Amino acid sequence: MTSALLNRLNLYPHAAHALLGLIAVAHVLTLWFALNASWLEWMIAVACWFITGSLGMAIGFHRLLSHGLQTSDRCRRFLIWCGCHAMTGPPISWVAIHREHHRYSDTPLDPHGPEHKGKAWVQLFSMYHKPSIKYAKDMIRDPYLTQWQKHYFSYHMALIVTGIVLTMATGSMVWLALHAVPAVLTWHTGSLVNSFGHSEHGAKDSHFISMLSWGEGYHQLHHQNPKAHVFLGKNAPFDVSGLVIKGFINKDAR
């Protein structure tokens, strides 16, 4: 793959600035939603949060793309589609940053290590990092992923603008519940895993963070065995994404 194509796939720092700009607008829209939404609209937002946070990020981007969970091609594409609506960055960049995190975990080179960058910085800017494509070379051969990588920001910009226009035109908050609100919830609950899922000794497990992040809070277990896709049992009772994997995606996953 040529360096020119890699540059188009990466687009840093413009991509990083665009990501922060999009999520900043989504925060404003979420505040608007919180002040005006009905209980039904909140329920829709939570359902979409499950789609983006569990199906998309915890399973799709994390356990499948980053760590090799096996499933059918149709299911794989659906999970990636869900993850691409979470507004945490395009898939190839996200995978590269996450694998770099594993490579340099809890060192000054960790892209989002709270001991070196600070918990507040990690919570707010955990994905503001230049991805090194060498950590995702297997991703750039997939045309489905490269198309998402190229059009990710224009796609989300269109969704944001459409959501604002439809909300103002109809007076219904449901349009924000479908995109902006679950994106913000996914951003912050996912960031909790890195900002507060660490101690001075390294990654740590948290039932509370796991409940908020669909099972991603078992951070120490994950770092001990990154290729494990399911964390269940008495040490990890709140791995909702693991239950989804075992029940609907790959019953043989471990």
Q: How would you label these PLM feature ranges?
A:
Residues N194-D239:
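Glycine/small-residue-rich hydrophobic helix-like segments
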